[in-house]
Curated annotation (Swiss-Prot):
Signal peptide: none annotated. Pfam families: YbjQ_1. PANTHER family: UPF0145 PROTEIN SCO3412 (PTHR34068:SF2), UPF0145 PROTEIN YBJQ (PTHR34068). InterPro entries: UPF0145_dom_sf, UPF0145_YbjQ-like. Belongs to the UPF0145 family. This is UPF0145 protein Acry_1752.
Amino acid sequence: MNEILVVTVNEVANARIARVVGPVYGTSIRSRTIVGNMLGGIRAIFGGSQEGYIAMVNQTRDEAIAALKAHAASLGANAVIGMRFDSGEFDAGQGQAMNEVTAYGTAVILEAVM
């Protein structure tokens, strides 16, 4: 599979949009372990950076982008423009919070402009 370009802007320098393929998305859902949640709760009481949560959110975003690229590639696109994130948290029961991130944008076929 060729690398899919993902950008947050709607235009790419030295390229033109040959065809708009359509909307694409990729979603990832992750949770911390019970121990991680307890340690995070203790850190929240005393203040400070939540490295465990930051790492989890970053990994979730990376997975969402990978899924976005796979979706775009499956439709024959070579780029995604206007990429954005949407995120949320939901209760999976028994006090287990799940973090959900969706990356979305418009799949296109770009051609180089000479």
